[in-house]
Amino acid sequence: MAASLWMGDLEPYMDENFISRAFATMGETVMSVKIIRNRLTGIPAGYCFVEFADLATAEKCLHKINGKPLPGATPAKRFKLNYATYGKQPDNSPEYSLFVGDLTPDVDDGMLYEFFVKVYPSCRGGKVVLDPTGVSKGYGFVKFTDELEQKRALTECQGAVGLGCKPVRLSVAIPKASRVKPVEYSQMYSYSYNQYYQQYQNYYAQWGYDQNTGSYSYSYPQYGYTQSTMQTYEEVGDDALEDPAPQLDVTEANKEFMEQSEELYDALMDCHWQPLDTVSSEIPAMM
């Protein structure tokens, strides 16, 4: 049974022939390519659907070339692929993820996925985080559908070798609420890992590392596709993220507290009778 992948971040000049040739250059054969266009203007919406002979072929292609340089693209771009459901309900089954650190630059999405899936069949995918120039930041994420396998991987693969040139560093990745606006196309499983807490400057804390729990924060946005309206993808910027642990200025907080306390004290004292001069002083008459 044929299966399709969603492909995004396309330039207007990238037509069906261009997409087919790009996959062929990577050693992949596609059945067909459907460029999605705006119904009113006819202008390409920036994404397409690529059909393969079967689900296994599509899945293999996804893990093999997703994130790799797109042949012939000017300016330089990378394959941005995902599963496509064409309006069907996305898979809402639980997912359990791990943060994978200390990755060397040679590790890509496919290598990360293959390293785990060969031992843990429930591994759903892997993603190496890249900087704007396409260079690995040295860490990534892997997702599982089986929590027990996620926990096994955390224990059994901690410090393991064989993925790049360094032992891997693992930690549980804890999801945070997604703030992605709804868009008009869908992926069954999202591999967009670009939304993280960014409140500090150092390596771990910059990506949501909790030194108390030894965990990282991430978010997997979900999308929905409908045939009625075509709309391009909107990236969520850093302004949509929250600092989960803002710094507290203790000195300023104490100053504000004391000022409020003094105002309250003065108000309470002003509402009392003034003290008498002596014990024998006459009590003032009521006004």
Curated annotation (Swiss-Prot):
Coiled-coil segments: none
Biological process, per Gene Ontology: selenocysteine incorporation
Keyword Phosphoprotein: no
GO CC terms: cytoplasm; nucleus
Major subcellular location class: nucleus
Source domain of life: Eukaryota
Compartments in which it is found: Nucleus; Cytoplasm
UniProt keyword terms in alphabetical order: Cytoplasm, Nucleus, Protein biosynthesis, Repeat, RNA-binding
GO molecular function, one term: RNA binding
The RRM domain, residue ranges: 3-86, 96-175
Function as written in the Swiss-Prot or TrEMBL entry: Involved in the early steps of selenocysteine biosynthesis and tRNA(Sec) charging to the later steps resulting in the cotranslational incorporation of selenocysteine into selenoproteins. Stabilizes the SECISBP2, EEFSEC and tRNA(Sec) complex. May be involved in the methylation of tRNA(Sec). Enhances efficiency of selenoproteins synthesis.
UniProt record similarity statement: Belongs to the RRM TRSPAP family.
Subunit structure and binding partners: Found in a complex with tRNA(Sec). Interacts with SEPSECS. Component of the tRNA(Sec) complex composed at least of EEFSEC, SECISBP2, SEPHS1, SEPSECS, TRNAU1AP and tRNA(Sec). Associates with mRNP and/or polysomes.
Protein name per its UniProtKB record: tRNA selenocysteine 1-associated protein 1
Organism: Mus musculus (Mouse)
